[in-house]
Swiss-Prot record:
Taxonomic lineage: Eukaryota, Viridiplantae, Streptophyta, Embryophyta, Tracheophyta
Gene3D superfamilies attached to this UniProt entry: Catalase core domain
Cofactor requirements of the protein: heme
The protein's name: Catalase isozyme 2
Residues that bind heme: Y348
Molecular function (Gene Ontology), one example: catalase activity
Catalytic activity reported: 2 H2O2 = O2 + 2 H2O
Key words, A-Z: Heme, Hydrogen peroxide, Iron, Metal-binding, Oxidoreductase, Peroxidase, Peroxisome
């Protein structure tokens, strides 16, 4: 169906102002009163409708990624990977797919300065011929916790104190002291990359491992990596304070203005590929979202390019109501066993139904651009006009049938029902390797962030000692530097 045929009239359809019901409005300034100074009458229908509509203009903000900006464009395949996947939108070089991309900060609220230290969201919706594929990632390749049972607590710890509504690092460091696997993400969070100069100059990662499946049914694990063609640029703390004090929407403005003048942002997409049979070769679990895949062993393969060449037409309709879901995949792609990814498949759809409504997938920005059909019907704010008599399947009166089968990974799984920690935690090695890859001045900025936040008077000696231990296990000299500036001895 074409949603535009059934949408309410807009101001452009009539030469004069009307109510929602189409009735003419001849005075949009003065309320209906008893005399010039009398009480306002409830029978002023236009006034009541106008106020009631205004009261309901806003929807609940996202629990995470509330502050964001969107843009449209296309993804173009530049390198043949048809031997790895049967996904139609990746079928051959030159194939283009329309996309919408949303950049965001993770923790901070809608309207907060875009210059604050935070992980940035990098979410891409591909409108393919086989349905939507949502690659919902960030500008860092890892996350704080590997199991979704800790996710609500993770976000609560990062968000403001519920009593004062102030973000406080004593809460953050207290909670994550129980999650040693979080140190690797802090090696990104306290690094320069979490102060990107804008959205155009930051990398993007799919974060989770997915699977690519070819026509023969052979599956490979895959990780996605976006690299900006204009390079990665970050701010110092001082620059971030200055930029945020000048314009709290600097990154949104930069993105919008760049596209408006034809300076289109572009990213190259590359992938890591891993044969499932090689998973046990590593000293870490490759499906652990707190780990990266080493490029020297699993080099990046080029796939395509992402170009953003159109600004959105309506911020509310195409940014606030834009909804992503890691569960949206297409034939030739599949999920991995990553515990956090598995639970995001449920959580994202659930939060969109709460935030936007049960029929959020009918909104033009979320609906697939290919032909689609199912028997999901009615519900609050349904605006799809349907006149068929058969709303079930199968039926001899309706030609709708099952789609042709496509390959999905098939493995024999066995094990006991249990709640357990993965075998290869290896919580500190990659954090240390990242620290040692930096120049001394970058290392010093990282150490300074730890010293700053561990110096909070509400951070106890026990919490400081735990973090010094974690840092020392990642890199002995890093732990010593932080400890010496805190007048604490590192413990192993």
């Amino acid at each position: 169906m074409d949603p535009s045929k059934f949408r309410p009239s807009s101001a452009y359809d009539s030469p004069f102002l009307t109510t929602n019901a189409g009735g003419p409005v001849y005075n949009n300034v003065s309320s209906l009163t008893v005399g010039p100074r009398g009480p306002v009458l409830l029978e002023d229908y236009h006034l009541i409708e106008k106020l009631a509509t205004f009261d309901r203009e806003r929807i609940p903000e996202r629990v995470v990624h509330a502050r964001g900006a969107s843009a449209k464009g296309f993804f173009e395949v530049t390198h043949d990977i048809s031997h790895l996947t049967c996904a139609d939108f990746l079928r051959a070089p030159g194939v283009q797919t329309p996309v919408i991309v949303r950049f965001s900060t993770v923790v901070h609220e809608r309207g907060s300065p875009e210059s604050l230290r935070d992980i940035r969201g990098f979410a891409v919706k591909f409108y393919t011929r086989e349905g939507n594929f949502d690659l919902v990632g960030n500008n860092v390749p890892v996350f704080f916790n590997r199991d979704a049972k800790s996710f609500p607590d993770t976000i609560r710890a990062l968000k403001p104190n519920p009593k004062s509504h102030i973000q406080e690092y004593w809460r953050i460091l207290d909670f994550f002291s129980f999650l040693p696997e979080s140190l690797h993400t802090f090696a990104w969070f306290f690094d320069d990359v979490c102060l990107p100069i804008n959205y155009r100059h930051m990398e993007g990662y799919g974060v989770h491992a997915y699977q690519l499946i070819n026509k023969a049914g052979k599956a490979h694990y895959v990780k996605f990596h976006w690299k900006p063609t204009c390079g990665v640029k970050c701010m110092t703390e001082e620059e971030a304070i200055r930029v945020g004090g000048t314009n709290h929407s600097h990154a949104t403005k930069d993105l919008y203005d760049s596209i408006a003048v034809g300076n289109y942002p572009e990213w190259k997409l590359s992938i890591h590929i891993m044969d499932p049979e090689d998973v046990e070769r590593f000293d870490f679990d490759p499906l652990d979202v707190t780990k990266i895949w080493p490029e020297d062993i699993l080099p990046l393969m080029p796939v395509g390019r992402l170009v953003l060449n159109r600004n959105i037409d309506n911020f509310f309709a195409e940014n606030e109501q834009l909804a992503f879901n890691p569960g949206h995949i297409v034939p030739g792609l599949y999920y991995s066993e990553d515990k956090l990814l598995q639970t995001r498949i449920f959580a994202y759809a659930d939060t969109q139904r709460h935030r936007i409504g049960p029929n959020y997938m009918q909104l033009p920005v979320n609906a697939p651009k290919c032909a689609h059909h199912n028997n999901h019907r009615d519900g609050a704010m349904n605006f799809m006009h349907r006149d068929e008599e058969v709303d079930y399947l199968p039926s001899r009166f309706d030609p709708c049938r099952h789609a042709e089968q496509y390959p999905i990974p098939s493995r024999v799984l066995n094990g006991r029902r249990e709640m357990c920690v993965i075998e290869k935690e290896n919580n500190f090695k990659q954090a240390g390797e990242r620290y040692r890859s930096w120049e001394p001045d970058r290392q010093d900025r990282y150490v300074s962030k730890w010293v700053e936040h561990l110096s909070d008077p509400r951070v106890t000696y026990e919490i400081r000692s735990i973090w010094i231990s974690y840092l020392s296990q990642a890199d002995k000299s890093c732990g010593q530097k932080v400890a010496s500036r805190l007048t604490l001895k590192p413990t192993m």
